[in-house]
């Protein structure tokens, strides 16, 4: 689907090359930016190249690159407000880990979906996540259209269990170009140091 956003205030994030903002148009073709311009001739050329393009009037709106959340545990949206103002290790050992031990994979997906929708509504288009059942969180990423770097998390996990988790993640979403995988520590103090070595 081709889109053309017109009459928007564009914040291109290239201040050293261009003015900080300008009024113009942004064209999208084949899921890629194909036009960022205030030149009426280039905007009209985009229309001719893409007959039937869907136009969206951005008058009074700002168009900018999506924000990136570089550290989150998106499924923990369900735990917001559960235990606040507590020292980290007490918070983890006495509240969070016991709570998480009771969670089902479906509840983790629900928390992830809520967190992803919240991020999208706030302009976040990419996030880096580290949590349990990332292969299931990847399903939510696929459904909701956001980009993600999902971290295979480990805490008291054997190398074999960790490798199985990574294989599940890749099998679940290996063909989705919006998802990347990485290795991330979930906790400041994994008790099994062999995996981190």
Q: Where does each model-flagged region fall?
A:
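Active-site gating loops and adjacent loop-to-helix segments of metal-dependent hydrolytic enzymes
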Residues: 78-110, 117, 144-152
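Mid-domain alpha/beta scaffold segments of enzyme catalytic cores
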Residues: 126-184
